[in-house]
Amino acid sequence: MATGANATPLDFPSKKRKRSRWNQDTMEQKTVIPGMPTVIPPGLTREQERAYIVQLQIEDLTRKLRTGDLGIPPNPEDRSPSPEPIYNSEGKRLNTREFRTRKKLEEERHTLITEMVALNPDFKPPADYKPPATRVSDKVMIPQDEYPEINFVGLLIGPRGNTLKNIEKECNAKIMIRGKGSVKEGKVGRKDGQMLPGEDEPLHALVTANTMENVKKAVEQIRNILKQGIETPEDQNDLRKMQLRELARLNGTLREDDNRILRPWQSSETRSITNTTVCTKCGGAGHIASDCKFQRPGDPQSAQDKARMDKEYLSLMAELGEAPVPASVGSTSGPATTPLASAPRPAAPASNPPPPSLMSTTQSRPPWMNSGPSENRPYHGMHGGGPGGPGGGPHSFPHPLPSLTGGHGGHPMQHNPNGPPPPWMQPPPPPMNQGPHPPGHHGPPPMDQYLGSTPVGSGVYRLHQGKGMMPPPPMGMMPPPPPPPSGQPPPPPSGPLPPWQQQQQQPPPPPPPSSSMASSTPLPWQQNTTTTTTSAGTGSIPPWQQQQAAAAASPGTPQMQGNPTMVPLPPGVQPPLPPGAPPPPPCSIECLLCLLSSPNSLCLSPNRAARIPPRGSDGPSHESEDFPRPLVTLPGRQPQQRPWWTGWFGKAA
């Protein structure tokens, strides 16, 4: 045995290396699977042991597929021989060793997962697991050649393909209609020009599913649809009706109440029979022909209705000034129908004669209505301006009514110049015991001065310049007509006279005791009255007073009581006092007392009338005392009533 430096390693035996966990030379390695227990508890059944082993195998295959450790040996010599290569359309090889190994592992894992689901229904396969692409298919032949009049394809597809989609959803299968007639004529096929799959076969429905149960279920529904289309007519096919209704709903043309059957409590109330009643005369609803208020256009009209309508139409046109006055207006049988006559008036006494007609041509127009150049006041000044012109002053009167006085030429309602004026336009007769008017007083003006310029046919009195217009007097207050122009005395009145005429009919009071002044020289106001009357009688007296003076001066007419040169004035009007003349004495003690107590009171004494302030003075306004006059009771006298026209003399002055 060699010792020392010449010793060889063979002389000393080598030591065995220590085993460590990092040593790669160890052949036995521990496999750790996450989620799997490393210690198996005792007392497991065989099914539990099998489930544990199958789950370990599934986890191992999943790990290999996920990491790509397919177990292919790196040495090509250790590999098995490869089959014939298969290439796709792009020139790539499909059956490589890696592809074949992965496919083999996936099939093995799929088998294990199917077994594990059978052992444990609560088992969940891995997230990357996909079942194999193997599918079960079947064909259902469509007898289109035997029944060409039936649209089987339409029944299977349905509106917008909804029927076919519903079957696929229920059976979890894929249904395709193939064969001859499945594609519409003119529709483009494949882009490469090749035939579609199954195009050369008869018309059929191809059903494909993952399981055979789903395929059988889909095939059964397709056969039921084909049988219903063959045995049931189209108008009685419920499936066809439902498809048409669904198509209308999709197109927006569905009527919900077409096939709706209402229950008794949902039905609407019955309509009223009145709404269904139709009139045979006018065609309206809601009434019968006997209750109809309208007449047919062809119904004959009575002569009385025609005459009444013609009369109303002519009256309307006459008021508008477009037609002559109807014949009934000019008749002398009764008073004319005018807007003024239509106003309500108090009834006249039965003893009074009826007023003459407005349009009568047998009598002449009274002279006081004829205006001439010899009068003191011209026509336009009397009426407050020319026709259509402005008023002449603050006391000017409005225009007369065209329908009564003919203010507008050519109007059908013009007054006849040869006939008498209407009753309210006639002047009152002069009193029996009074003299003529002074130059400043011309008596009551005609009624046409008091009527405003109103439209024709309106029948309404308007207010002119803030002054109330006076309507015509009542029939009971009408003054008697003027005396006739002949020499015969006027007839006595047949009716009751107004109070102021009754007072005039009384005999004049006895003259005062004779004295030198009374017998030789008259009083100042009497001198002025006599002189004025005499001078006015020559040419300044109004025409209507001239006519009365001529009638009084005729030899055949009896002389009136009193001064023959005096023309009587209306009651309540006295001539004005001359300038500088003393005022007349009071008529009595009672009159003096009433003057002191109420200066504006009414006294019917001739001397008291001279003290009444004129209308244009600063005295109290009497605008509201035009008509009717109030009754005034004085001591020792009867109640008197002033005539309605006495208030106008102050205005005219």
UniProtKB/Swiss-Prot annotation:
> According to its UniProt record, what is one Pfam family this protein matches?
SF1-HH
Motif Nuclear localization signal, residue numbers: 15-19
**Which positions bear Phosphoserine?**
S14, S20, S80, S82, S89
Q: Which SUPFAM superfamilies match?
A: Eukaryotic type KH-domain (KH-domain type I)
Keywords from the named record:
Acetylation, Metal-binding, mRNA processing, mRNA splicing, Nucleus, Phosphoprotein, Repressor, RNA-binding, Spliceosome, Transcription, Transcription regulation, Zinc, Zinc-finger
Q: Using the record's annotation, list all stretches that form the KH domain.
A: 141-222
Q: Which PROSITE patterns match?
A: KH_TYPE_1, ZF_CCHC
Q: Which Gene3D superfamilies match?
A: 6.10.140.1790, K Homology domain, type 1
Regions of compositional bias (Low complexity) in chain numbering: 335-350, 515-534
Compositional bias segments (type: Gly residues): 382-394
Q: Where are the residues of the annotated region Disordered?
A: 1-44, 65-94, 325-584, 611-653
Where N-acetylalanine occurs along the chain? A2
Q: What is its main location?
A: nucleus
One molecular function GO term is: zinc ion binding
Per the record, the zinc finger regions (CCHC-type) lie at: 277-296
Report the locations given in the UniProt record: Nucleus
Q: How is it modified after translation?
A: Phosphorylation on Ser-20 interferes with U2AF2 binding and spliceosome assembly.
Self-association state and partner proteins as the record states: Binds U2AF2. Interacts with U1 snRNA. Interacts with RBM17. Binds EWSR1, FUS and TAF15.
Q: What does this protein do?
A: Necessary for the ATP-dependent first step of spliceosome assembly. Binds to the intron branch point sequence (BPS) 5'-UACUAAC-3' of the pre-mRNA. May act as transcription repressor.
The entry's protein name is Splicing factor 1
Q: Which organism is it from?
A: Mus musculus (Mouse)
